[in-house]
Amino acid sequence: MASKKPIFVLNGPNLNLLGTREPEQYGHQTLSDIEQDCRARAEAHGYGLEFRQSNHEGELVDWLHDANETASAVVLNAGALTHTSLALGDAVRAIEVPVVEVHISNVHARETVRHHSHISAPAAGIIVGFGTMGYGLAIDAIARWTET
Ligand code: DQA
């Protein structure tokens, strides 16, 4: 039986600081806690996990291109680049592998500048405002899609 390609979880700028960064917005879990949770969920569904974070837009674009070749699906929290990066939106549009956009906070309840996302239109789905639990929900959704 061919083994499934891993799920990629890609994180953008400042998410390396989770745990200490604005805990009233993002809670107390660190990125490493989130990675452990994602790995357990992915493995429970029979997937491997590739979990990455970058503060650099171009690196995230490169990883989305890689994902098109080597991933089953992508969970993407692009941080503030969500609201500014046409290049990331174009990268999501350019690849065939499904991308689930995740935000820890409810961006629609925050400043107006956070209401627009370059990623939402080309994304396969969006999970917003469920705290760090959103990453696991995205992995469960990907597993459900690919089972059916
Ligand atoms: C975020 C929301 C963005 O507006 C913000 O810039 C982030 C985190 C979230 O997960 O809630 O860095 O993507």
Region locations from a protein language model:
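Short glycine-rich anion-binding loops that position phosphate/pyrophosphate groups of nucleotides
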Residues: 13-15, 79-82, 105-107
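Glycine- and acidic-residue-enriched helix-capping/strand-helix junction motifs
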Residues: 18-32
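Short acidic/histidine-rich motifs immediately flanking catalytic phosphotransfer sites
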Residues: 67-74
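Active-site-proximal loop->helix
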Residues: 88-91, 110-119
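A charged, well-structured terminal subsegment
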Residues: 128-148
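Short beta->alpha junction loops
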Residues: 48-58
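Extreme N-terminal starter segment of soluble prokaryotic enzymes
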Residues: 3-7
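Short, acidic/small-residue loops that bind anionic groups at enzyme active sites
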Residues: 93-110
